[in-house]
């Protein structure tokens, strides 16, 4: 007994020491130059040469629609538009004209977005043009403080904004969103400040209102400049100081309030229907207090949560593949939200409206199974392997990372205070900490995030299915049910290798170099031609494809649909003696992605891998070609699901679908090989 007490004491002490070691800040990327001007504007500068002669710029404004007054609803978004309609250095439309003449395109190189809490302007600029390089920083400065907000231009823009709102209003997804968001925001200020605003205000607001919003919230202490690209860092810093230092902070500026979404008791249920929604879904949102990631202990918790998300997603994916599964697709995940919250989200697509209750029961059962019995050791080990693959890829490709991929880390640091690490830290930290994350730690996350408090359950579907779908009372009953007969997961593991016998291969009968394009062409004795081309686009990636002439054009009309669907069915059946689920488990921790296809004139396969996993990828390619696994249950399940999806798609017709189908019918004279598939085609 004394020894047991000593062991427990030793364990407790070691745990405290371990926690203390990680209770230190997460280190930011030391290559990033971070500074703050005297007026309060913060800036982030990182030299990165991928792509060469290009720079990513962002102006981040810590202000969005949530800060609007009652009479300003929609003006944060309106102001974003107005910044392209006249500034001090670029009157009226000269800004867009200047950038387009410089070879930049609106949307790809030049854009902006307004959300509830922030507004972000973006530019992608060539750095090999001295004039454009300097002008880019002037553009950001103009957006931040020198918008002209001319009354005539405001009146012109009203129609554009109203048309944008009208177009969204005619879109089913937008209509659903406008009903869904106030529910998720629980009648907080967020629910009353959707960025699109109110039509009557957009039509008639006086110019002084938008000027006031601009002066109140576009101010130095609420703005940051982000610059990442192929440039001289000192030159960029000098340009930021030159263009932004003259901006003055307003006197008596309003306080930037951080709003929160209040909690609600228990589970709330809703039914949101629309005439143009083709497929009904079940969605559930568990709202949880925001967890900030500031220390290395927090970062370790983030990794455990990443593993949790991987495992729970795989559970649902595997469940959807089972014979007679009540849902076609399902996802669950834990992630940041807004208003001081994180969210545990569930989305499920049942086979049809009649099967909605069964789909919900299956999802609730799976959540309860995980809470009751936890994950398995095998699930955790595979998730760790997959996580490490991603970290290793980032580490090996760190000098090939695109500038755009760095930007969001700096934006989130400014807005949320989250750290921006580099690939070296992420790799070293994972090597030290990943293996030590236990099943108990991950299972504790399950109990933390899967709760019935402050939860919203929704059925989003077609008005035509109203009578077939559970009403709000029935949905609440389904969500509260606890199945007493649940059992722990029985894993379907891979017991055999991809290939039980490795083929002998064949000889190379000819070799030819094509120096103009850097390709070596090999011809094998069996007639297969292989073209090899070394590249330096990536450090740790091999991309491959193979094709032959043929495709569905070789098949008779009677066999056309079988040929068209063949590759999809093959991809779901597995290879050799491995089911698709077993194959996924066998490939855990490996980068060996292979797809097959049957086109109109060709068929083939392709994918990507790494030098380390090339052997596995080649075996998988060979297995798909020579040993595709036919599983009658998989075929039956796939065809049934496909038929249901097609039936749902024609049951609820949207204007876009009707237009597209009509164009196809006219262009191709209603030929079944070129027009959208119908439910009855699956029976052929």
Protein language model features and the residues they cover:
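Flexible helix-coil linker/hinge segments at domain or subdomain boundaries
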Residues: 150, 249-253, 372-380, 631
